[in-house]
Amino acid sequence: WIRMLEQNVYLDVAWGGASFAREDKLIAIPIDLLGGILGVRAMVIRRDDRLKFNNITSLAMLKKLTACQAEHWPDTAILEASGLKVHKTAIFETNFRMLEKGRCDYFPRGIHEAYSEIEKYQILWGNQLILYDELLLVYPFNMWLYVNKENQALAQRIEYGLKQAINDGSFKKIIQTHPVTNHLFPLAHWQGKRLFVINNPLQNIRNTKEAWWLLREFPFYQQIDFSQAKD
């Protein structure tokens, strides 16, 4: 889709994770489509490992374990840049199988998607794996809309509309009511979680309201300082 937008054929707008490379080629509309929570990761783990994860109290301890990730995901490079060990897979579903077989110890998933994914997994394959959300791995990772560099008018119009949706509450309402993301609420559920904040060397960090408009409402937001994120 990047090439199609660059060449201004077939597509007028597309969504994707933030990166220096994409922002160099396209106009990124800096209104986060998930409110800044894309980089907030819970862990899919083996059910028998719950106690082990209860006892993880530092990033150094997590670095002794191995994450499963798809080899082509930006998250893989983000984790490796912070010194986390990663077992790479070619297909999304393979991550669950590798975790079952002990090839890795955890599979980090965005909190907006993890609950529906583990529910689907358990229906298909049983209850060997669970979602562990007492420990969150957090890194800055935005989700932008992109348009061709020559399409300034479209970019401005989309930015105006998204800002209006944030300000009138309708954007948040979509996330609150969508069946994939409604489990995030009430946000008080996220009080008292253990956080490990790491750096993202792949994107420009924007300190704007629109980049983190939903994340700012989470009870742990004040614990996050991306400028002090660890490598």
Positions of predicted regions on the chain:
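Ligand-binding clefts/hinges and TM-proximal coupling segments of bilobed small-molecule sensing domains
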Residues: 70-81, 162-230
